Amino acid sequence: VACPSCGTKNRVPEAANGSPRCASCKTELPWLVNTTDAGFAKAVNTPQLVLVDLWAPWCGPCRMVAPVLEKLSKDLVGQIKVVKVNVDENPMVAQQYNARSIPMLLFMRNGELVDTVIGAQPEHMLRGHIDQLLAKV
């Protein structure tokens, strides 16, 4: 991930304590990671609000929502973590959350599900939903 402040490229860990920071200037970085069935529990176990995107490469609406989630991860640095799970490659997570339709967005905190949104949503609707969940902290 390129630092929005100094441009330095950084590796962002799938799981960590706190939010990722730039190695050079220490600015908080957007936290957007891909995970697997094996790494899922570790990736979502954080007190920060986690938005999990259950998606597949062949899914048109999933491809439409991907840039929205990337933008939200940049706009809400330090407030949310976005975790992407390809359900074709990681069917156990999809099965665990009964994902029958994608994209399916799971909102989690400390590894616990707090809300779900099914289908592609425009940015303003997702942002409003996230704002409501952040206000409940």
Where are these regions (language model features)?
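Short cysteine-rich clusters marking metal-coordination/redox-active sites
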Residues: 3-6, 22-25
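Cys/His-rich microdomains that often coordinate metals
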Residues: 10, 28-29, 66
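Short linker/helix segments within small regulatory modules
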Residues: 12-20
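Short Cys/His-rich micro-motifs in 6-15 aa windows
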Residues: 25-33
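A short beta-strand-turn-helix
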Residues: 33-50
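Thiol-based oxidoreductase modules, predominantly thioredoxin-like and allied folds used
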Residues: 35, 54, 65-73, 77-92, ...
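Short pre-active-site segment immediately N-terminal to redox-active cysteine/selenocysteine motifs
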Residues: 48, 55-58, 101
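Non-catalytic, surface beta->alpha helical segment in thiol-disulfide oxidoreductase systems
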Residues: 101-137
